[in-house]
Each structure stands twice: as structure tokens, then as C-alpha cells.
From Swiss-Prot:
Family statement: Belongs to the DNA glycosylase MPG family.
A Pfam family: Pur_DNA_glyco
CDD domains: AAG (cd00540)
Record-linked SUPFAM superfamilies: FMT C-terminal domain-like
Presence of keyword DNA repair: yes
Source organism of this protein record: Synechococcus sp. (strain CC9311)
Keywords assigned by UniProt, alphabetized: DNA damage, DNA repair, Hydrolase
Source species taxonomy: Bacteria, Bacillati, Cyanobacteriota, Cyanophyceae, Synechococcales
Enzyme Commission no: 3.2.2.-
Protein name: Putative 3-methyladenine DNA glycosylase
């Protein structure tokens, strides 16, 4: 299902937004839009509700102690997709942050989609599948309104209430509090222990009628 909207409602984030450490950019991406321009000109979009940060000095980072053709994008210019395949099955979509020659990035873990099942993009693999993102999109810029871009938050999410917790599915640096999610969202891949899913009547649900 696509969600037509006027492109002016989805102003691309500037590259300067991404020229900061991942642990700064990660929480600030919560509430921003992931947008895809489809072949018919319509826009498929959702609200980012969960992210994780990774840095070169972090043992869980792909760029920790190694630089290779497979992770070269992670060492490159900020504001580009870094897409890799996890366990040979799922694509995971990251955004490169900080500076060139320093592996740093934010993993997009979950997106809330208007008018669709609440968990259709609740996890990195599901997110990539819903938007059709794969290795061919590795190194593609996210700062311009091309096929894909990231856009600023809507006014209703100027100050989102976030949960800060540890990352998921890693064997090292498990204690770093570098995962964030929108507390009122039901589209988060996994909630922190003790944090109950909000009732449907109280949950954040993106709507096609938003006015920005």
C-alpha cells in the first residue's frame, strides 16, 4: 500500500544533521520520516520509531578493527545508507554518521506505517523488506529527495518521549545504552524489560491527515 503525499511535507534532513556521532543522531532520528518515491510518483513513508547506534571503538560495530570492501560505506561520507545482509537472510539498513574514515552509523530498527498493520516494519529485516531496501542501495545518499530520503519530524513529534535501553542481538558491548524507541509506539521490535506495550487507544499511530 502506498501513501501519496506532497513532497513538500517531507523535507529532507540536511547532511549536517548526520555529521555528528551516532549516539547523538540515533535518538534524534526517532520521529523522523523514511520516505520512498515509487515508480508511479507516489510516496511510501513511515515514521522511524526505533534506532541503534554503533561506533568504530565499539566491539559490536562492523568497522571495529577492520575495514573491508563489505563495510567500506560505513567509513565513508555521512548521510548515506549502509546496507548489509544479516545471517545471509535479512537486509539491515543503517545511516552513516559522524565523519569520513571513522566507522559510525545508526541502524534503523523499526518504522510505523500509516494505514498498515502496526508491526509490518517492526524490526530491521521487516523494515528493509517493506521499503524494498537491499544491498543495491548501499552508499545511496539520504539527504536529497531522490528514490529514498530521511525527512524531519512532524510537528506532533517535536519532543517525542523516548525509552533509552541496550541494543539487541549482539554478543559484545551489550551494556551500552545505545538503543532508543518511541515509548508510545506499538511498532517497536522489542520493548525494554518492564515497559508494557501501550493500549491501542493511547498509542502513537501515524496518520495520512497530518499537517506539518
Amino acid at each position: 500500500m502506498s501513501h501519496p503525499a506532497h513532497p513538500r511535507r517531507f523535507s529532507a534532513l540536511p547532511q549536517a544533521f548526520f555529521c555528528r556521532p551516532a549516539e547523538v543522531v540515533g535518538p534524534e532520528l526517532i520521529g523522523c520520516f523514511l520516505v520512498k518515491r515509487q515508480n508511479d510518483g507516489s510516496l511510501l513513508w513511515g515514521v522511524i520509531v526505533e534506532t541503534e547506534a554503533y561506533s568504530q571503538d565499539d566491539p559490536a560495530c562492523h568497522g571495529y578493527r577492520r575495514r573491508s570492501p563489505q563495510n567500506e560505506t560505513l567509513f565513508g561520507e555521512p548521510g548515506r545508507f549502509y546496507v548489509y545482509v544479516s545471517y545471509g537472510i535479512h537486509h539491515c539498513v543503517n545511516v552513516v554518521t559522524d565523519r569520513s574514515d571513522w566507522a559510525n552509523g545508526v541502524l534503523l530498527r523499526a518504522v510505523a506505517m500509516p494505514g498498515e498493520p502496526e508491526r509490518v516494519a517492526a524490526g530491521p529485516g521487516l523494515l528493509a523488506r517493506r521499503f524494498g531496501l537491499n544491498r543495491t542501495h548501499d552508499s545511496q545518499a539520504v539527504c536529497g529527495e531522490n528514490e529514498f530520503w530521511l525527512a524531519s519530524r512532524p510537528s506532533v513529534l517535536n519532543v517525542p518521549e523516548l525509552v533509552t535501553t541496550t541494543r539487541i542481538g549482539i554478543s559484545q558491548a551489550q551494556d551500552l545504552p545505545w538503543r532508543w524507541y518511541l515509548q508510545d509506539s506499538r511498532s517497536v521490535s522489542r520493548r525494554a524489560r518492564g515497559d508494557r506495550m501501550p493500549a491501542l487507544s493511547q498509542a502513537f499511530i501515524p496518520t495520512l491527515e497530518w499537517k506539518r
